[in-house]
Amino acid sequence: MADFFASSFWTGFLWPLIVMIAQSVLLLVVLLVAIAYILLADRKIWAAVQIRRGPNVVGPWGLFQSFADLLKFVLKEPIIPAGANKGVFLLAPLVSCVLALAAWAVIPTNLGWAIADINVGILFIFAISSLSIYGIIMAGWSSNSKYPFLAALRSAAQMVSYEVSIGFVIITVLLCAGTLNLSAVVEAQHARGLASLIGLPQLTILNWYVWPLFPMFVVFYVSALAETNRPPFDLVEAESELVAGFMVEYGSTPYLLFMLGEYVAITTMCALATILFLGGWLPPIDLPPFNWVPGVIWFALKLFFMFFLIAMAKAIVPRYRYDQLMRLGWKVFLPLSLVMVVIVAGVLHFAGIAPK
């Protein structure tokens, strides 16, 4: 009996726990290395637009610049302002970073490649992205300074404005896919769509939701910029107005955690756009040599394409005024996304093509 309970404990609890921890550590390492090079790519793209070289000294072509920056931040001493609430001040960057990383627990980068392939994966990511505002509000309030506090208030209003639009975008995709499971959303873009209707099922690129839902793709792209405080919606950390926004009192490792959380959140939005609109890990053409390439490579290429679009917005679009930002969210995107939900639902119902 004792042997039975011991074996049940090992196979039913301990071994799955060890596997999950190993998967989490592997994902964390891969994600952090990817973020280092995404940050470098962001700086390189910005430099190319401005006809500069960008980071090119540390390592060949500047490939180790992000690791040099990491070492610099870690070796600096964190300074806490005299009037700050020390506990909340130090907890804020940790909250921001951990919540951003937690979203990747449900994101599949290939078929079956997810730590937790839950049936409500989209809702989980939506909830995590909504909670990320708390790290910024904690930082703004605990710094005991007017610039971070004003940035925190801006951030709260900005994220509430664009969360609603992103929610309606997700609803339109769910109507087409018929599921909240992220892997099932990708598989739905392989099984049915325009390519199947015209008798060319190998052209999976025609099944991607970016084509029938292109207005919602644009809304998602712009809302993702606002959600992650990226230019031209970087009013939370506007250098010309608020110095560095909610991070003005931060330095050393806490500042590094905020930057890490910001770029992980950007990467999460790119991954979500890849899954919802660009077919996830599916090749554009389901024929050799395209389907010889591993799905995770296609996923990474599409993710970087989305990041390139976000980086280009930083380089070429001027910053919006705060009232313009609010007007765009509430008077343009919210009505547009709501109308699109009604149109998509009507077309699916009356055409008889709604998923069963």
Swiss-Prot record:
Record keywords, A-Z: Cell inner membrane, Cell membrane, Membrane, NAD, Quinone, Translocase, Transmembrane, Transmembrane helix, Ubiquinone
Membrane topology label: Multi-pass membrane protein
Highest taxon above the source species: Bacteria
Record's GO cellular component terms: plasma membrane
Record's subcellular location: Cell inner membrane
Name of a matching Pfam family: NADHdh
Molecular function, one GO term: oxidoreductase activity, acting on NAD(P)H, quinone or similar compound as acceptor
Protein's GO biological process: aerobic respiration
Catalysis: reaction(s): a quinone + NADH + 5 H(+)(in) = a quinol + NAD(+) + 4 H(+)(out)
Top-tier EC class: translocase
Transmembrane segments: 18-38, 87-107, 120-140, 166-186, 205-225, 265-285, 292-312, 333-353
EC number(s) on file: 7.1.1.-
Function: NDH-1 shuttles electrons from NADH, via FMN and iron-sulfur (Fe-S) centers, to quinones in the respiratory chain. The immediate electron acceptor for the enzyme in this species is believed to be ubiquinone. Couples the redox reaction to proton translocation (for every two electrons transferred, four hydrogen ions are translocated across the cytoplasmic membrane), and thus conserves the redox energy in a proton gradient. This subunit may bind ubiquinone.
PANTHER family named among the record's database cross-references: NADH DEHYDROGENASE SUBUNIT 1, NADH-UBIQUINONE OXIDOREDUCTASE CHAIN 1
Subunit structure as annotated in this protein's UniProt entry: NDH-1 is composed of 14 different subunits. Subunits NuoA, H, J, K, L, M, N constitute the membrane sector of the complex.
Sequence similarity: Belongs to the complex I subunit 1 family.
Protein name: NADH-quinone oxidoreductase subunit H
